[in-house]
């Protein structure tokens, strides 16, 4: 039987100013869908997998072709509906409505489990969209670099007097998200030892300059770390190995007086025990075969390995090493496997990122549909021009230009908040209008943002008012972005932490240089981050309440206005 998800063809987004669709409002989602499957972008494009275990861009190759064909013929008064990667309908709407509305992997809560999802997936009735895979705004590993960088910098501020020079970070996973860690660490001034069980992943990160060196033994990797930290250099090494073995071994060596990491985290694809985590002692080839032949055994073995992995992380924490969960739900699995103390160490959002979320600051990103890197460099300069006092942001943009290799369509990410997003979006649109840019740009974000996600083990962990699991907020965010006129809007379940543990929404808007686009940008790029300020103000955070007042938000049930 032919696998409808396998195809050896190579997909790359069109470049330049020529349209393949009827307008830029439909050309933009077409190009970004194709860009998600570019071999320089996606982790496993032949299987439609973009990143994050089995995060896909379309349900099957037939669905991909139908989506692409529909986008090419869609008018400016029609909207395409996509249900878990399948184009299910086209309906008459209006010019300011989204051109695409996407819902991926959503399940009624009682049935929101990996077992039930995997049954549906096997029958061809569902698709796991992760966050930006099924919403067509993945820009490669750069997409999470700055968030990881901000986390490491803040950890340095809190634990090491503001400097990570001569320090080293231990982590696991070099997939589409985890691959950001070594580069983010180096940008923050630290060394990084990243454990990865699939050698092709290490090689991919070497090729795209996200990791500096490769090691095949722990001793070899530690020798590199020792040399670099003593010299005050910031460099990274990808170690071929299994984190469930390497982490406990490092604990053992640390307790015997050996090397001690300065920060410990992990970004393996532990959110998906069947597809995302290699059990201890298994080969990659064996894992691939048994996922099909004996999925229950794979999951059981992976979960047991994760427990060992987390036990080691808690041992580091107990020894005084700053340790953080980076949002892959590995603590939850370890607890379910009987390790009661799995949540001893915090998640990265409550530990380091939440004050940014309170001001609507999060992962603002844009991509140049022209395919020309110069368009991104020009927008970088515009960001600096419009944020003259923000030296931290300027330093980030300089480092990003120097260190980050573009994957697929040239793109940039920078964390900015309420007010700045709208100003930058309008400026980019004006640059398109004036011919400064060779083609329109799309502006979007990760679903990991201040107002667009409910994820009690990640973004909304330990909320001040206990509202961690309330998922009205991402639903309201998606509805408001739809009403505001985003070019495409998505609502997903299970991204980052897996089935049953998150709901989240995304939006993308196309800046094509028109006055219509400017009006939509003004609404969308104000309202979207404003929902994050609203959500955190409702939870009682003073920073968010002050921001809401300062920005003049009307929040009747919160501010009484």
Swiss-Prot record:
- UniProt organism field: Rhizobium rhizogenes (strain K84 / ATCC BAA-868) (Agrobacterium radiobacter)
Record keywords, A-Z:
Cytoplasm, Histidine metabolism, Lyase, NAD
Gene (name only) = hutU
Q: Which cofactor(s) are needed, names only?
A: NAD(+)
Look up the record and name the pathway of this protein: Amino-acid degradation; L-histidine degradation into L-glutamate; N-formimidoyl-L-glutamate from L-histidine: step 2/3
Q: Which HAMAP family match?
A: HutU
Enumerate the Gene Ontology biological process terms.
Answer: L-histidine catabolic process to glutamate and formamide; L-histidine catabolic process to glutamate and formate
* InterPro entries, per database record: Urocanase, Urocanase-like, Urocanase_C, Urocanase_central_sf, Urocanase_CS, Urocanase_N, Urocanase_Rossmann-like, Urocanase_sf
Asked if the record carries the keyword Lyase, the reply is: yes
- State the GO CC annotations: cytoplasm
According to UniProt, the name of this protein is Urocanate hydratase
Q: Which reaction does it catalyse?
A: 4-imidazolone-5-propanoate = trans-urocanate + H2O
Name the catalytic site residues.
414
Question: Which GO molecular-function terms appear in the entry?
Answer: urocanate hydratase activity
Q: Which residues bind NAD(+)?
A: 52-53, 130, 176-178, 196, 201, 242-243, 267-271, 277-278, 326, 496
**Co-factor remark:** Binds 1 NAD(+) per subunit.
